């Protein structure tokens, strides 16, 4: 099992690997990256990953407006999901460890579901053991719909123009 970790603390990925190897008696080879753009670059270089584990708090946000943060996060995850396909099985499951404030049924979960991210951990479910379970057995679309508590008619499956730059991205570039 080859996993790309994008969490803000290497101790987290080490703990996940140790727990997974204890639970499933399977070795994990991994790489740690520390920026959203580094995930994309790594996936462009190496298509052999089996799973991607991302901490929502990977990077500090230049803004404390939740809507702006959600748009930034969605744009990054959309770009990552576009690159997340491996040479063997197609799409690489993305496991997102959500922030404290995330709740089931929220608009961001509907958007993430729409781009095929079915493995977000929320609230009390954000544990090393649950990350290990999702690495071993990612959720199906049906399981994700039930876990996220969303209705099919809420989901907007839309293609995003890869050449367009969102207003949020422009503002973050200007601030930086």
Segments from the language model and where they lie:
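Long, basic/Gly/Ser/Thr-rich N-terminal segments
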Residues: 1-173
